[in-house]
Amino acid sequence: MAFQLDNGYYSHQALAMMRKKKTEPRNAGESSGTQQATGAPGRGPSQRPERAQQHGGGGWQPANPQYAQQAGRGGGQHQGRGGRYQGRGGPTSHQPGGGPVEYQAHEYYGRGVQRQGGMPQHRSGSGGHGVPASPSRTVPELHQASQDQYQATVVAPSPSRTGPSSLPVEASSEEVQHQFQELAIQGQSPTSQAIQPAPPSSKSVRFPMRPGKGTFGDRCIVKANHFFAELPDKDLHQYDVSITPEVPSRGVNRAVIGEIVTQYRQSHLGGRLPVYDGRKSLYTAGPLPFTSRTFDVILQDEEESLAVGQGAQRRERPFKVVIKFAARADLHHLAMFLAGRQADAPQEALQVLDIVLRELPTARYSPVARSFYSPNLGRRQQLGEGLESWRGFYQSIRPTQMGLSLNIDMSSTAFIEPLPVIDFVAQLLNRDISVRPLSDADRVKIKKALRGVKVEVTHRGNMRRKYRISGLTSQATRELSFPIDNHGTVKTVVQYFQETYGFNIKHTTLPCLQVGNQQRPNYLPMEVCKIVEGQRYSKRLNEKQITALLKVTCQRPQERELDILQTVHHNAYHQDPYAQEFGIRIDERLASVEARVLPPPWLKYHDSGREKDVLPRIGQWNMMNKKMVNGGRVNNWTCINFSRHVQDNAARSFCRELAIMCQISGMDFSIDPVVPLVTARPEHVERALKARYQEAMNILKPQGGELDLLIAILPDNNGSLYGDLKRICETDLGLVSQCCLTKHVFKMSKQYLANVALKINVKVGGRNTVLVDALTRRIPLVSDRPTIIFGADVTHPHPGEDSSPSIAAVVASQDWPEVTKYAGLVSAQAHRQELIQDLFKVWKDPQRGTVSGGMIRELLISFKRATGQKPQRIIFYRDGVSEGQFYQVLFYELDAIRKACASLEADYQPPVTFVVVQKRHHTRLFANNHKDQRTVDRSGNILPGTVVDSKICHPTEFDFYLCSHAGIQGTSRPAHYHVLWDENKFTADGLQTLTNNLCYTYARCTRSVSIVPPAYYAHLAAFRARFYMEPDTSDSGSMASGAHTRGGGPLPGARSTKPAGNVAVRPLPDLKENVKRVMFYC
């Protein structure tokens, strides 16, 4: 898609990346494998009647008169290869029986059962190959194949053999904005009257009510890892807790309150067994015999800050605790909410019940966020470099349609092995540390790994005092000394340990651990310290550790279900004294839930192939006997081999086979490179890329040609090479590239080559497939008028990184009615800022005065330039938002969308549907009968298309779980979609079916994917942009998945939803204009 950034002000990159598997390491480059990793109106929108729809007319003038639409506004029908397809604006003839009432998608019953007549037969005739003839509009295509293509909506000039296709002269951003305003004068948007003004504050927002439950699809029963929790009939009381002196440790606070309960439960607490949140609140099931009382508590301090050079007496720590009545927790409103008679969830009551059920596990296990871990809950697995995985379980109480529900799931995370520090350091460095001195890099690695870790000393027999490491000494142990009195007498650490403890330090060349604070440094030799058990490792894992951890967490559905049931049995909630005290009873059976399996959509391929249409089977299909619906053109390409294991002949053979596969798949791909293949060393990547590019351009430039594609062969473990190559190609040279790993070059399977061909095709301007329903205008609330579909996400640096910026990405469809191609923009913003700051911007320009910009505005202009029409409907899929951030994100980002639209013309306010996409939840769905092959896929998971919108969903709001993909390994995680704003008034069937069908349009593979592609692309676009950051802020050492790039809870990794203000963030480098025009990110 060709589009320009308005005024050249923003550094947003045109991105919409295709995703690597989450388990694939960063150095895996871009190689494609054979598997993919993976109505009642709402309360918000106005209910004014909309004006009559005016597709293709009513003042919608194309951006360029030579690309004016050919179709009449009344909707004459066009006879094309695909049978009688309707022109833009014509009535859609819905046929009964094939889908939900508003989604009659071809003459098919249920899951692909063909009705009499079947698919329309695509015959020769007017129009492009394999698709209906329809009105032409301007959609710039950079690389057009020489074969006849799908031209449903494009009139493009003949491509040149020596370079990219000629493009129509594009209007500037100012001209496009002027056209928006002209259109407003000629004919007001038919949807603008249906828009409700943005609420004055987030508190006034009401999320849409559920518009009824879906009915489309084959009904079935699934089991969910939700357990019914009976609401207690108790009088809950809240008390404020003040502990003096204040300590940051929840563990210490709990110990203080625990001491009070042990000593004073009967005498002062009236026999009550309270629960405590570790901070400021204590709850009881009934009143305490006082409204305010002070307690004095003494704890033995086991976490000493004293070491070498100070007294060794164990301290007693006195605390003064004031417990004061605060309020009664009202469960009546919770019951009203669960019954659907109250809009807002009473969060306080839910929090109390959650604290009650967490009290006992917190005492038994190691709590991490909402999970609990123990070495006794499963076998430990070594992850390498001194780390091990612990098994545990996630637990959270949730309001659902069936009432209160306890969500239990299995989890694993990394803990530091309880090793002697000497052994830990040896494992960390993967060498014998006594052989040679530590390098500066070794010291940095050790310090980073051990800072904040708790250790216990081993040189004093049974007296195992504990300390927290604050740093590492710069000197060796033998060089360290400290004063022992006020007269300046100095003693070395080696002498002190020999004389005081009779301990001879052997590793005197190693640094000491520094404990305590920096002002009063205290030293502990490494060899007298052992790491305390039960410390979670919160820093970044390397690739091998991630792979090892994923192997531990990967469980087949039946095994996971059994483990969950065993966990519930082991927790014995019926014997939990705190649950008994508060009257909470937990059903130990998995929830049985009604579900539906949505049918897969028909996909359109080119008519020149033997198979022109395909109906996916169990979420997958292949490219055999099919050709891409729009094959791209690659006239001029070259290859650089960065792998020392691949010989030139093998590399040339691989490139030739790949070129042939691209041709077979429907592309116009030259067999021979424009310049011969060359081999280069990874450390010389920039020199090699620029030299090869210049050599190719010396040949092509006199002919008016361009280098269309670079094929790069990378080592399997390539460090930062992949990121460096992408940054140089896309921000410096203006070149799209395809990276292939050495192992795939040697294997060279047909499946792999076919997958790579899919990626190359969309990188050079082609399309792989299109929904047939899109071509026949049968997608409700998408096909009836120009609709733009957005995806947005923010990825954050790992919690261990203190200052790296967060990356926001927004992608948007650029073709209508196909909704297949997505342009994207990215932006760096303040560290861990969740609200997308650059959706809309206004700034002062010295020459032009007040200027508007931002990602939404730029993508709307891009859509207008590509289609010749303004979007009359916006569907916005937002990834990465937790429930606690719903109100802030909706209020801030919906307001930005509104302002971006209004900046293009005063009354331009297309209706918006804002949907949050969540994958980081713990709901799992299991087949009711694992042995029934009709209800499970080959991996034992539920079938793709399984949707649930009852029982375990929100009591009143519009949400659903959708498993849109087939499982590969482990247990499939359904995506959770929650509608926060809906001015388009989707029905449950309409939005569920649209979302499911879009999951079959992901460009990089012939499988349906687990989340809707625009959200998928946005996540990947943001991930790709990290490669563009300068080395001092970029994190190029590891390829952590989304699960490792987001923090949670009120810890250092917490995300902020406060506007960032004027925090200075280094902008990302600009992409080259010719790269922006294509889907280079796949």
From Swiss-Prot:
Bias type Polar residues, positions: 29-38
Source organism of this protein record: Oryza sativa subsp. japonica
Protein name as annotated: Protein argonaute 1A
PROSITE patterns, alphabetized: PAZ (PS50821), PIWI (PS50822)
Chain positions covered by the region annotation Disordered: 17-148, 187-208, 1036-1065
Chain ranges of the PAZ domain: 420-533
GO cellular component terms, semicolon-separated: cytoplasm; nucleus
Family to which the UniProt record says this protein belongs: Belongs to the argonaute family. Ago subfamily.
Job description of the protein: Probably involved in the RNA silencing pathway. May bind to short RNAs such as microRNAs (miRNAs) or short interfering RNAs (siRNAs), and represses the translation of mRNAs which are complementary to them.
The Piwi domain, residue ranges: 709-1030
Biased composition annotated in UniProt, kind: Gly residues: 72-100
GO biological process, one term: regulatory ncRNA-mediated gene silencing
MF annotations from Gene Ontology: RNA binding; RNA endonuclease activity
Assigned keywords, A-Z: RNA-mediated gene silencing
